[in-house]
Amino acid sequence: MTLDEYNAFCASLPHTSHVVQWGGAHVWKVGGVAGKVFAIAGWSDEPIPYVTFKCSPASFEMLKSEPGLRPAPYLASRGMLWLQRFNEKSMSNADLQDYLRESHRLASLNLPKALQVKLGLNGLT
């Protein structure tokens, strides 16, 4: 997945916003600019970016040792359940999109309930 493909996919999810920060990383949030981060891409010298996403406890345990995946630097070391795909051979782009969709859903659950209802995200549980 190229950076353009990553950005296009994240933009297709409901109520998302994009910012470039943290050393040129493409950061996607759900719930607007003050919302919750659900995906980060960048930090790679290769044409394919490293993609970091939030996941469930079961997915984290299942995937954290798979080739091409690792607990996300900084985030996972602080107890957060985030993984980073740093090699395209580890997970198909279709699977990555599924995990990005799930990350979006998980992040939306951390928005204030009133905002979830206002944005129509309360049905994502």
Specify the residue positions occupied by each region the protein language model found:
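Charge-dense, helix-prone N-terminal extensions
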Residues: M1-T125
